[in-house]
Swiss-Prot record:
Classification via Pfam families: AdoHcyase, AdoHcyase_NAD
Catalytic activity: S-adenosyl-L-homocysteine + H2O = L-homocysteine + adenosine
Protein name as catalogued: Adenosylhomocysteinase
Obligatory cofactor(s): NAD(+)
Database matches in InterPro entries: Adenosylhomocyst_ase-like_sf (IPR042172), Adenosylhomocysteinase-like (IPR000043), Ado_hCys_hydrolase_NAD-bd (IPR015878), NAD(P)-bd_dom_sf (IPR036291), S-Ado-L-homoCys_hydrolase_CS (IPR020082)
Record's cofactor remark: Binds 1 NAD(+) per subunit.
């Protein structure tokens, strides 16, 4: 094994095992070859150093792909301090490789809730005092919330927040509506090169991988219920169909439900006539009694509630690929049923009571990743080529906000600029072009006459903001 040396005297990190750094570095090198957009931005902007002076607080899954993102930010001039946004999602070899490179990181797989919050605090603090950060890169909104609640004085120096996922965007929009958001944010999640790649195509790849790794089950011929048919639900449904499962979809949005029908999925409800009145009587027990696998994909709370869990088929697999663990009512399961760990991130939930269980009892559910992100808890998440688009968006969003220097503006101007916006389409197209080049593709250029005819520039952007890809 080739050695990776941590800079002498560098102790500003906490990872599971620093000796995993060489392994992590080897995987980082491979990931770089699979992330053409991110590496293209690194080459394109390295000479300009657009992030020189940027001090970025980062809270996103500490994976190999995130390691490439971190080192790209550093290559463009930034200083960063990093933690993971999920207690199970860290790849310990990735965290070790970043620490060995002299970059502050606080993350390991299997953190407790208390350790998770401690890790975020360690990114905020340097030598026991709030770091003079001026940018935030978040996934899910926990870092953003802690800064607003516990360190509001730091927000006076912060130019902006870039948010990775649906849940975090919802939290930002709520804060903006309630008047509690203090700095502008870019909604990276709804960039086309994020939402279509990460949310749809990424889940198509990684969901069935995680379920198979966690359970060793054959999926073909079995029945699955996917809760939600947004981009994550679409990719998840395709992922299970690829395995030969009989996939049904539950949706609250008629448009998404229509899309599911058009894509060949049966749209059903776990509730009789679609109405949840909070009672067991409202559950469609005949439907749930046939379901072998249930997957939540919504970013909403209790979409797989206690009454549904009671009615599910014996030995059904239950998992979530939304951001937080509250999509499934795991609190009810902890309070009322016995948990038996089969292996890390795989539990048998015995529905025979809270105290004790018979190991040979067959009235149980198999819960993956304790209801947290299954693809990162039970597998390694999306492949590098998928995360390439998401993280290239993050880099461009960080540059975009850092150049605007919100914290330096007069108060009156700040009030006008306070918003949650999607990354400009021209930047979205820049990411897409680099990704196409990475596949060896060639994009056709409009002639001036063609561009004039449809009312766009030869260089783009090519679609209005209202266009639905």
């Amino acid at each position: 094994m080739s050695a990776v040396m941590t800079p002498a005297g560098f102790t500003d990190y906490k990872v599971a095992d620093i000796t995993l750094a060489a392994w992590g570095r080897r995987e980082l090198i491979i990931a770089e070859s699979e992330m053409p957009a991110l590496m293209g931005l690194r080459r394109k902007y390295a000479g300009q150093q657009p992030l020189k002076g940027a001090k970025i607080l980062g809270c996103i899954h500490m994976t190999i792909q995130t390691g490439v993102l971190i080192e790209t930010l550093v290559a463009l001039g930034a200083e960063v301090r990093w933690s993971s946004c999920n207690i199970f999602s860290t790849q310990d070899q990735a965290a070790a490789a970043i620490a060995a490179a002299g970059i502050p990181v606080f993350a390991w797989k299997g953190e407790t809730e208390e350790e998770y919050e401690w890790c975020i605090e360690q990114t905020i603090l340097k030598d026991g005092q709030p770091w003079d950060a001026n940018m935030v890169l978040d996934d899910g909104g926990d870092l953003t919330e802690i800064l607003h609640k516990k360190y509001p004085q730091m927000l006076e120096r912060i130019h902006g927040i870039t948010e990775e996922t649906t849940t975090g965007v919802h939290r930002l929009l709520d804060m903006l509506k309630n008047g509690t958001l203090k700095v502008p944010a870019i909604n990276v999640n709804d960039s086309v090169t994020k939402s279509k790649n990460d949310n749809k195509y990424g889940c198509r790849h990684s969901l069935n991988d995680a379920i198979k790794r966690g359970t060793d089950h054959l999926l073909s011929g079995k029945q699955a219920l996917v809760i939600g048919y947004g981009d994550v639900g679409k990719g998840s449904s395709q992922s299970l169909r690829q395995e030969g499962m009989i996939v049904k979809v539950a949706e609250v949005d008629p448009i998404c439900a229509m899309q599911a029908c058009m894509d060949g999925f049966e749209v059903v409800s776990p509730y009789k006539n679609g109405i949840n009145d909070g009672t067991e009587a409202s559950i469609d027990a005949a439907l749930l009694g046939k379901i072998d696998l249930i997957v939540t994909t919504t970013g909403n709370v209790n979409v797989c509630d206690a009454n549904m869990l009671k009615a599910l088929k014996k030995r059904a697999v239950v998992c979530n690929i939304g951001h937080f663990d509250n999509e499934i009512d795991t609190a009810f399961m902890r309070k009322n049923w016995a948990w038996e760990e089969v292996k890390p991130q795989v539990h048998k939930i015995h529905r025979t009571g809270k105290d004790g269980f018979d190991a040979y009892n067959d009235d149980y559910l198999i819960l993956l990743a304790e209801g947290r992100l299954v693809n990162l808890g039970n597998a390694t998440g999306h492949p590098s080529r998928i995360m390439d688009g998401s993280f290239a968006n993050q880099v461009l969003a960080q540059i975009h906000l850092f150049e605007q220097k919100y914290a330096d503006l007069p108060a009156a101007e700040k009030a006008k600029r306070l918003s949650v916006e999607v990354l400009p389409k021209k930047l979205d197209e820049e990411v897409a072009l680099e990704m196409v080049k990475g596949f060896g593709g060639v994009v056709t250029q409009l002639t001036p006459k063609q561009a004039e005819y449809i009312g766009v520039s030869v260089e783009g952007p090519f679609k209005p903001d209202t266009y639905r890809y």
